[in-house]
């Protein structure tokens, strides 16, 4: 073997171990999905330390399968095994991650989104090989529901208390009564939060995915929100309503022509209107992201499977991706004609 191609055994085993752990983790993701969809985690949170029989009865699942599932979860540290009593439970921390929907640390939306990518893996392979785009609506419904569940805690925890107050004068306008455009609203979580918090304001929410808008309308109707309307619309076709605030939450990078969209939004704003863009956490530059952003690998993965293909399926097809970084995003906003751009 040529000296330049000799394998460093220590590095080989380190890499093999890392990949093996990733494979084990992928199995754990599927176990987590089973526990979420069947209600086992929620049943365990309700019961406290309980036998396999008790958990199976409460969650209405097969007892033998449950034992195997609990054993797998115990090995990953997802549930707690009490050897002296032969019972299983969730610690408060485990419950906050796996069982409690409204906790900011609930991981199940992310799990759901990942599982959805394995449902139509043949399409992912074809897209990767051919370079064609993949429209958002071509994904399994787990992608839509999982995305909403993943981002919901962040919006609930930060949108009203941090992001909106960080923009000078915007919150006062919303309290008095303003016009808001929520673009790329998906299932409408951000739209409903603003409509509930600011009843004097009118919220118009837009998304090009019809089934998501249908579901958002149902959810808004259940809440009785009469200051919120949903529309099926391309992001670049928002009507000129002189909006006081236009928002895009974690969707700008998915758009085929983000500069063109930003230009269109600029035209729909009132003279003193504000455009707020929220994007996934990213740093400037690949090396910087790899070394200093622990979530970058995951988001580059989502970019490969979802975000870049969604962009390439639209006119222009820039393929910005979810890890473009603040410098690039601010350059694009400046290109779109926004003269005052600040990073909050």
Residue ranges of predicted features:
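Short glycine-centered segments of the SAM/dcSAM-binding site in methyltransferase folds
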Residues: 179, 273-274
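Short helix-to-turn junction characteristic of helix-turn-helix DNA-binding domains
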Residues: 44-48
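A short glycine-rich, Lys/Arg-flanked "PGG" loop and its adjoining helix->strand segment in the class I
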Residues: 259-271
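Conserved S-adenosyl-L-methionine
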Residues: 338-344
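Conserved adenosyl
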Residues: 107, 116-253, 258-262
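A short acidic, leucine-rich amphipathic alpha-helix
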Residues: 52-57
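Conserved Class I S-adenosyl-L-methionine-dependent methyltransferase catalytic core
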Residues: 6, 10, 18-27, 31-43, ...
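C-terminal alpha-helical "lid/dimerization" subdomain adjacent to the S-adenosyl-L-methionine
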Residues: 278-335
């Amino acid at each position: 073997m040529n000296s330049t191609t000799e394998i460093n055994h220590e590095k080989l085993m380190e890499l093999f171990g890392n990949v093996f752990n990733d494979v084990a983790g992928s199995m754990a993701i599927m176990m987590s999905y089973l526990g979420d969809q069947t209600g086992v985690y929620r049943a365990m949170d309700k019961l406290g330390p309980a036998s396999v029989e008790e958990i199976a009865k409460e969650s209405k699942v097969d007892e033998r399968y449950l034992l195997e599932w609990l054993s797998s979860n115990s090995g990953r540290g997802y549930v707690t095994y009490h050897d002296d009593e032969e019972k299983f439970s969730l610690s408060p921390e485990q419950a906050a991650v796996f069982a409690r929907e409204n906790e900011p640390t609930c991981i199940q939306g992310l799990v759901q989104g990942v599982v959805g990518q394995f449902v139509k893996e043949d399409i992912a392979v074809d897209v990767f090989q051919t370079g064609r785009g993949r429209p958002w609506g071509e994904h399994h419904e787990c992608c839509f529901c999982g995305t909403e569940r993943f981002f919901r805690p962040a919006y609930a925890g930060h949108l009203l208390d941090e992001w909106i107050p960080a923009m000078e004068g915007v919150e006062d306008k919303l309290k008095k009564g303003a016009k808001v455009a929520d673009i790329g609203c998906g299932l409408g979580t951000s739209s409903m939060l603003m409509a509930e918090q600011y009843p004097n304001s009118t919220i118009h929410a837009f998304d090009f995915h019809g089934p998501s808008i249908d579901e958002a309308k149902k959810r808004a109707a259940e809440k009785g929100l009469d200051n919120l309307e949903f529309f099926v619309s391309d992001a670049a076709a928002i009507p000129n309503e002189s909006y006081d605030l236009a928002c895009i939450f974690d969707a700008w990078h998915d758009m085929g022509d983000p500069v063109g969209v930003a230009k269109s939004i600029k035209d729909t704003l009132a003279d003193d209107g504000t455009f707020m863009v929220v994007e996934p956490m990213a740093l400037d530059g690949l090396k910087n992201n790899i070394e200093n952003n622990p979530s970058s690998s995951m988001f580059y993965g989502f970019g490969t499977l979802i975000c870049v293909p969604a962009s390439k399926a639209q006119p222009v097809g820039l393929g910005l991706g979810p890890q473009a970084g603040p410098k690039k995003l601010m350059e694009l906003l400046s290109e779109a004609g926004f003269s005052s751009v600040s990073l909050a």
